[in-house]
Amino acid sequence: MIFSASAGKETDTTLFKTTQADPQAEQIVFKENNKQSLHKVYNKAIDFALQEDVERLVLVHDDVILESYSERKLDKLFKKFDVIGCAGTTEVNLKLPALWHLMGGWFGSGNLHGAVAHGDEERKHMTAFGEYPKRVVLLDGVFLAI
């Protein structure tokens, strides 16, 4: 599992706190201090994974709470999909701002799929975008398993 965090603050991230007890969740932190855009950090992580012959790469925002990270669940999904995410769109119109749900036609378009919970460890609300799992053309970068 690779995520980007400020140097010296990686253990303060929500992701670190919620996965440190999970022996399956090996973490590698790119300490970019918000000086590089996330897509550059993700590309750097992909290059690293290729060089190190990493079997599975999970790219995730550092503010994510993984309540049920499961290698078995990923194994099952990898039988059907090459890349796994929690939300995405079946159609895309590239434009600014480059937000997946806006480029996918917004809510009610029928193009958005998946679900994401927002909130904190005490209170959460679920945003369900549509049917999932579903083959899509663009994924939200909040969680990507390759």
Where are these regions (language model features)?
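Short beta-strand-to-loop acidic/aromatic patch adjacent to the donor-nucleotide binding site
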Residues: V54-I65
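Conserved donor NDP-sugar-binding/catalytic core segment of glycosyltransferases
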Residues: K35, I65-G110
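Acidic ATP/Mg2+-coordinating residue in the GHKL
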Residues: A7, E32, D62
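A recurrent flexible, glycine/aromatic-enriched loop bordering the glycosyltransferase active site
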Residues: E121-I146
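Active-site nucleotide-sugar/metal-binding loop of Leloir-type enzymes
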Residues: N43-R56
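Hydrophobic targeting segments
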Residues: M1-S4, E26-V29
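Short, acidic/glycine-rich phosphate-metal binding loop used to engage nucleotide
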Residues: E32-L38
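Short, well-formed alpha-helical segments that are part of the catalytic scaffolds
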Residues: G8-P23
